[in-house]
């Protein structure tokens, strides 16, 4: 049947059709190969935007550095990083004047956080540049390796477990003349396989000690590793993102804590809130501008776009901001916050894996690592790559490029938002001292600007003034990509506003479907996504009902669990039919056991097991939820789990769903192929780490688990806990005298062993 697509929209208001224009169905593009080229682009562009700055050489590392601050006044239309310090400081002063006490209060809040944060905060986050192995690692492993190296080099402040003490170690490590590190390496040897009598390559992993001098260590500590940003929609070119190492992470965390605390108090900031809370905040600003623009005033809104936000920001500017924000605060606090921007002013960008060469004729492939780019003959490269390498060569040291200006993506989102809001704040009439005035919203590099004035000339003048003010602090509004409309229609961080926010439903499309965790979680997540979209995204009842039917169908095909009375033949149908025939109450079978679907849009909030519990046969209940059944996973299943939901763009969202432990909550095993690679040593470290944590949690069930205070180690805490528990159990008669004395003996032995060590 042919459908005329225009018929679909006859009853739909135009603004609701925005969803259909988004490129958000289907798989997003992923990058393959190395990010070296993208990283070189970033480095070269960043220097180009600041090219009229002053060149200096870092005395410790010998890296050439470009400083554009207080450089020439920026030119029109060309993006540039020449921020003027006095302008930034003045913007900060006016921001404080409009919000009395804001900086003071945020500093006090942050000081409290600084004193309480444990070093395990750094284990959050995914990939981290591990400077000891010179490549990316999971955050927890990278932290463990760093602490291990610090310890073997006589730095022990971090034993107390406070992040601030770990940062003291980082500072001390930078003064050391040399550091000794442990690296992993691979040995290959050819041996004859006893079974097949063929020759095979056997790999063994070794650890070796290596000394690193001060200069090399500093370069590693200041290095940001780079990767290609994956899954970016609507772009032809990929771009590079940075993963900083452990030395930088802690300092950045404290700066962002301070900035977050400031953003929470600013009505123009789109961070750190999200979702409906963010929409409410935005709607308030719009309402304020609409009500104040009485009949005499015009009100226009710019949907703004900034050119290369990160590459024109400058860490030196952030240092100036922090110095101002923390003026009157204790010296130690000011020092600890100023280290992150100082490290970023001296940062090095690691160029990634390098280039891969193929000779079609000789069927050869070879990799040119980034370290070789400084010396290799350029005749092997094509024109554009040659230009990139020539440009970057003066900046190269040991396969990393000196990158003083610019910020790299996603490092100081909150602090850069504070800078943006400080310019929006200058739009009040008392500062513009004329008939036009402005306000707006800022969320990292995205902004919306609302300008009010008596006539069109006033609007134009207001926009021009805003544009020029931004230029003075290194923000470059793009005249090509920003557009202006009567207030009431604009877009900000993918929220479309048209006299109220329009649900951009297409953004949520990728999160519909089967997640692939396990049968239990997938069912729960699937219905929760539909429920949430009915609440938040205008998903109507009829569409929701259809989405539900499609989901159930998808789910049955994924897990091959078609109804027991179906004609569809799959690998599981024999077992499921047998179960169907011997079940008295067929409605009680879970969908994943070939049962019928009892969900409709009224009961999406109830986990399937609970929905069908009363309908189940008794023996089926017993199998499904029996804690003695070896297939019921008891990996600390809470009553609420978190799923990571990927919207079409924007950060991954965490979504809560109800989790009921059944035979269907299985956990897939780790892929074994990792065991044959150089990652194996790391995997063993990780498992050791995991075992220790699990053991610790056995002693301290989550209800009674408070973070250890003071300097007792995990072992001491567990031993003292074991003694207390044993005494209570013995006195209440739960354990016999022999068991009690055996526990005491074990505790004593552990303490003895620790002393001898």
From Swiss-Prot:
Question: Subcellular localization, per the record?
Answer: Host nucleus; Host cytoplasm
Read off the Pfam families from this record.
Answer: Flu_PB1 (PF00602)
Please list the reactions this protein catalyses. RNA(n) + a ribonucleoside 5'-triphosphate = RNA(n+1) + diphosphate
The record's region (Promoter-binding site) falls at: 249-256
Record PTM: Phosphorylated by host PRKCA.
Here the segments flagged for biased composition (Polar residues) are 55-64
The family classification in the record reads:
Belongs to the influenza viruses polymerase PB1 family.
List keywords of the entry alphabetically. Answer: Eukaryotic host gene expression shutoff by virus, Eukaryotic host transcription shutoff by virus, Host cytoplasm, Host gene expression shutoff by virus, Host nucleus, Host-virus interaction, Inhibition of host RNA polymerase II by virus, Nucleotide-binding, Nucleotidyltransferase, Phosphoprotein, RNA-directed RNA polymerase, Transferase, Viral RNA replication, Viral transcription
**EC number(s) on file:** 2.7.7.48
What this chain does, per the entry, is described as: RNA-dependent RNA polymerase which is responsible for replication and transcription of virus RNA segments. The transcription of viral mRNAs occurs by a unique mechanism called cap-snatching. 5' methylated caps of cellular mRNAs are cleaved after 10-13 nucleotides by PA. In turn, these short capped RNAs are used as primers by PB1 for transcription of viral mRNAs. During virus replication, PB1 initiates RNA synthesis and copy vRNA into complementary RNA (cRNA) which in turn serves as a template for the production of more vRNAs.
Matching entries from PROSITE patterns are given as:
RDRP_SSRNA_NEG_SEG (PS50525)
Q: Does the keyword Ion transport apply?
A: no
Example GO CC term: the record gives: host cell cytoplasm
Protein name (database record):
RNA-directed RNA polymerase catalytic subunit
Gene source species: Influenza A virus (strain A/Memphis/110/1976 H3N2)
Q: How does it assemble?
A: Influenza RNA polymerase is composed of three subunits: PB1, PB2 and PA. Interacts (via N-terminus) with PA (via C-terminus). Interacts (via C-terminus) with PB2 (via N-terminus); this interaction is essential for transcription initiation.
Motif Nuclear localization signal: residue span?
187-195, 203-216
Gene of this entry: PB1
GO function terms (MF aspect): nucleotide binding; RNA binding; RNA-directed RNA polymerase activity
Task: Give the GO biological process terms.
Answer: DNA-templated transcription; symbiont-mediated suppression of host gene expression; symbiont-mediated suppression of host mRNA transcription via inhibition of RNA polymerase II activity; viral RNA genome replication; viral transcription
**Top-level EC class, please?**
transferase
Question: Does this entry carry the keyword Nucleotide-binding?
Answer: yes
The residue ranges of the RdRp catalytic domain are 286-483
Q: Looking at the record, which segments are called Disordered?
A: 50-82
